[in-house]
Amino acid sequence: MHVQRIAAFSHGTNGGNPAGVVLCEALPAAEQMLTIAAEVGYSETVFAAPSEGGWRVRYFAPEIEVPFCGHATIALGAALALAHGDGTFTLQLHDTRITVTGWRNNPALMAALQSPRTRSEPAPPELVEAALGLFSYSVADLDPRLPPAIAEAGARHLVLALTSRQKLAAMHYDLERGRRFMTAAGIVTISLVQAETNTRFHARNPFAAGGVYEDAATGAAAAALAGYLRDVGWPHGGMIDVLQGEDMGMPSRLRAEITSETGASIRVSGAARQI
């Protein structure tokens, strides 16, 4: 089974978050997809097979299946554009339909996804306390303008906004402890962000639940963050840029476009490159 390797949300010819992409006539058994994802070793591998009106899609991390993965969807959009020409493709997830658009902008590949609907709610205080302990942060490190939240756009994320770029750069934690915490909390990643401006955010996304210390680019988390900003009335101006992967030597750029409709899909776009 051929696995394409594509880095999504890349910055020029560098960076981005690598994803495996498998285009097949029919989806393999879940156990086989999990095995392939583990062999590939990226944070996610996406599997897609033609179905009525589009493509049936499933996402696998090395240790678990995840309901949605933004960077793998961007990689899939690029792969579909290469295989079938520029266009918009309908993707059937487990419980919703989304679209991804892929196009060639020589020499670059580009893609944009429309996320599942978004929602957010304040994070329980005990969850926040445990998360701060995991990273050796304190309440004083949190940006009071953006209270801790559970945010969703196809997957659940804990959003913690920090006041300091230096604190974000110094992020560290124990992988096994983080895995237990995220699994028990039912969250896919912890989205650690710092607002440089109202529309420019630095981000790091630990993904211990999937056996990955940190994601270089997390499209689902960017969509969830954008939905959260809309919910709290943040002056986003309709668009934010998320800079991720800088502190791990894999610079990534994600753009999220935000409408005024509460809960509406977020458009997340970026470049992609073949590996």
Where is each model-derived feature located?
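Anion-binding (especially nucleotide phosphate/pyrophosphate-binding) glycine-rich loop
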Residues: Q32-V66, L192-F201
